[in-house]
Amino acid sequence: MIYQKQRNTAETQLNISISDDQSPSHINTGVGFLNHMLTLFTFHSGLSLNIEAQGDIDVDDHHVTEDIGIVIGQLLLEMIKDKKHFVRYGTMYIPMDETLARVVVDISGRPYLSFNASLSKEKVGTFDTELVEEFFRAVVINARLTTHIDLIRGGNTHHEIEAIFKAFSRALGIALTATDDQRVPSSKGVIE
């Protein structure tokens, strides 16, 4: 199933769709480094993303990065509500040369982000690295996930961010994996 949403504000105009059919993705955020990270997200999560974004990137990349995270989170929440029968938990360690990242995801209905990643530099190219946390906070809060992101070792900032994105994507993909168990994956009987 394809989930689609538009978001139009004074700062951004977004048209985003997500599906779990692994169809080809098209990503145009206007921010080269973010395009690269979201391409990794699609490959490693098994999800398909189509993004057409325009924003005030002449100011900086903050609004478009955060707003894309908001919409991806909202679309993931719709997908989760429709799925009902999924593994729920996902954990992944990703090494990238000198770097090691760990991400743990719980599709809990309780939004929480622990972001423990001191990135080595403030920029990768023109991309402000502080936006990595802003992006994940937007996704996690809007998808109502509990997520722990830990950069265990680092060195090269590009590698650090790439390892985090890959680990999150793989952990999310595991958590979203369909299961034959017809019970809601919570002893409470509900995930809200």
Curated annotation (Swiss-Prot):
GO terms for molecular function: imidazoleglycerol-phosphate dehydratase activity; metal ion binding. It is found in: Cytoplasm. Its cofactor is Mn(2+). It catalyses: D-erythro-1-(imidazol-4-yl)glycerol 3-phosphate = 3-(imidazol-4-yl)-2-oxopropyl phosphate + H2O. This is Imidazoleglycerol-phosphate dehydratase. The keyword Metal-binding applies. Belongs to the imidazoleglycerol-phosphate dehydratase family. Pathway: Amino-acid biosynthesis; L-histidine biosynthesis; L-histidine from 5-phospho-alpha-D-ribose 1-diphosphate: step 6/9. Substrate binds at residues 11, 36-44, 62-66, 88, 110, 158-166, 186-188. CDD domains: IGPD (cd07914). Mn(2+) 2 binds at residues 62, 66, 134, 159. One of its GO terms (biological process) is L-histidine biosynthetic process. Pfam families: IGPD (PF00475). HAMAP family: HisB. Keywords: Amino-acid biosynthesis, Cytoplasm, Histidine biosynthesis, Lyase, Manganese, Metal-binding. Its EC number is 4.2.1.19. Binds 2 manganese ions per subunit. Mn(2+) 1 binds at residues 36, 63, 158, 162. It is an enzyme of class 4 (lyase). GO terms for cellular component: cytoplasm.
